[in-house]
Swiss-Prot record:
Function of the molecule: Usually encoded in the trnK tRNA gene intron. Probably assists in splicing its own and other chloroplast group II introns.
Biological processes annotated in GO: mRNA processing; RNA splicing; tRNA processing
Family (UniProt): Belongs to the intron maturase 2 family. MatK subfamily.
MF-aspect GO terms: RNA binding
Name of protein: Maturase K
Species: Agrostis stolonifera
Domain of life: Eukaryota
Keywords from the named record: Chloroplast, mRNA processing, Plastid, RNA-binding, tRNA processing
Main location: plastid
Keyword tRNA processing: yes
Cellular-component GO terms for this entry: chloroplast
Protein location: Plastid, Chloroplast
Length: 511
């Protein structure tokens, strides 16, 4: 019992950080601007009349924030607030982006300090030798080959921004900072109603990438905290009530509502969490929960997650967002691949002295294939081919130089071939390569008002072949178990995070 109470207190320590005064420091906004320039994804810092970052604009912003009635008017009159009103002429677009970016940097400071002052624990291993996207498959083959069921989870988003603010109250006790966060979120939505339009969320995500990532990571870490804790303490669960270690701010009130639906839930032993072979993988807003348990056990996990999101985060998630499949009879979509674990029969001939034996051995093999239909459909949408896969020219590129046309087609072809070359069947890759090569030739022929045959005879097919087979730096990833909100001691569990440094753009629409 003392162990669980100490665990709760451990995560409540070092919360009294007052970070609000840092918003009045100029260097914070310089950091925010440098982050926008050095980010792996281009972040456009816009301003009125296309003005660039200026320390003078930041000083004006800080001067206005010192005004006594500035934030009061901003909250009471969000449609006419002094920060975003164009009638003032103080570069309102610049302020509306640079201030949330600076705020995101400030609120990240308590989490960085917590990581610095935490006692040194056992070093968390990092698999630095796995530097290729193709390392996923031997990794999954080693971990998932002996599992029976797989749950594919689409992690839901909270439909009300107030939920995200309440989650941060556990970690940040600086009340002015939380009120300022409400002010930012209030600008993008009607505060008294639920956000049912994805346009509002998309707008917030596009203009405030760092702040959106911070809020999303805090939400995911909170839900994973309970998932990992239940997984880690599964050996002790039959002895204690889960109410002992499910303590959180506001959660005690929601336990009552949960008890109405499931009376006696916290008094009974939750034995169904016990599973010695369970793996959890999160990537791109999705998660995979693999288990060797029974179908009944996995359904228990599914409904636990659904009710947990409903009664703890106060929003309903549809059961269809969690797909439960048996590995032997189905395949699953993972990072642009269709993966499966089919059973195959291997005939082994064994001879002992003069006797000959034939032994049939059933084996499992982790198989990965390229989704040909989806990729051809995406190329068709990008106007490289027809819906049936017939190559066509791309007229909008005919105004470019020959080298730019070759470079664009070459990059797409190499990226596709490198990323999907981990497939066990290469026929689809060669078909995609043929489509892009012929589409490139037809685009160049259309530009020079010639036929493909005449153009290829003049240019030579060897040049295209050499160009498309040119080597390029392959995408990198590493398997790590660290994160900003990592669960202490989780490195001894089967919890894996795929830290993908760069990913193929053509994979995103397929997911």
């Amino acid at each position: 019992m003392e162990k669980f109470q100490g665990y709760s207190e451990k995560h409540k320590s070092r919360q009294q950080y007052f970070v609000y005064p840092l918003l009045f420091q100029e260097y914070i906004y310089a950091f925010a601007h440098d982050y926008g320039l050095n980010d792996s994804e281009p972040v456009e810092i816009v301003s009125c009349n296309n003005k660039k970052f200026s320390s003078l604009l930041v000083k004006r912003l800080i001067t206005r924030m010192y005004q006594q009635n500035f934030w009061i008017n901003s909250v009471n009159h969000p449609n006419q607030d002094q920060l975003l009103d164009y009638k003032i002429g103080f570069y309102s677009e610049f302020y509306s982006q640079i201030l949330p970016e600076g705020f995101a940097i400030v609120v990240e400071i308590p989490f960085s300090l917590r990581e610095l002052f935490c006692p040194k624990e056992k070093e968390i291993p990092k698999f630095q030798n796995l530097r290729s996207i193709h390392s996923i498959f031997p990794f999954l083959e080693d971990k998932f080959l002996h599992l029976d069921y797989l749950s594919h989870i689409e992690i839901p988003y909270p439909i009300h921004f107030e939920i995200l603010v309440q989650l941060l109250q556990y970690r940040i006790k600086d009340v002015p900072s939380l009120h300022l966060l409400r002010f930012f979120l209030n600008y993008y939505s009607n505060w008294n109603s639920f956000i049912t339009s994805m346009k509002s969320i998309f707008l917030f995500k596009k203009e405030n990438k760092r702040l959106f990532r911070f809020l999303y990571n805090s939400y995911v870490s909170e839900y994973e905290f309970f998932l990992l804790f239940l997984r880690k303490q599964s050996s002790s669960l039959p002895l204690l009530s889960s109410g002992t270690f499910l303590e959180r701010i506001i959660f005690s009130r929601k336990m009552e509502h949960f008890g109405i639906m499931y009376p006696g839930f916290f008094r009974k032993t939750i034995w169904f969490f016990m599973d010695p072979l369970m793996h959890y993988v999160r990537y791109q807003g999705k998660a995979i929960l693999g288990s060797k348990g029974t179908h009944f056990l996995n359904k228990k996990w599914k409904w636990y997650l659904i009710n947990f999101w409903q009664y703890f985060f106060s929003f309903w998630t549809q059961p269809r967002r969690i797909h439960l499949n048996q590995l032997a009879n189905s395949c699953f979509d993972f990072l642009g691949y269709l993966s499966s674990v089919p059973k195959s029969t291997l005939l082994v001939r064994n001879q002992m002295l003069e006797n000959l034996f034939l032994i049939n051995t059933r084996m499992k093999k982790f198989d990965t294939i390229v989704p040909a239909t989806a990729l051809i459909g995406y190329l068709s949408k990008a106007q490289f081919c027809t819906g049936s896969g017939h190559p066509i020219s791309k007229p909008i590129w005919t105004d470019l130089s020959d080298w730019d046309i070759l470079d664009r087609f070459g990059r797409i072809c190499r990226n596709l071939f490198h990323y999907h070359s981990g497939s066990s069947k290469k026929q689809t890759l060669y078909r995609l390569k043929y489509i892009l090569r012929l589409s490139c030739a037809r685009t160049l022929a259309r530009k020079h008002k010639s036929t493909v045959r005449t153009f290829m005879q003049r240019l030579g097919s060897a040049f295209l072949e050499e160009f498309f087979t040119e080597e390029e730096l392959v995408f990198s990833l590493m398997f790590t178990k660290t994160s900003l909100f990592s669960f202490r001691g989780s490195h001894s569990e089967r919890i894996w995070y795929f830290d993908i440094i760069r990913i193929n753009d053509l994979v995103k629409p397929l997911n």
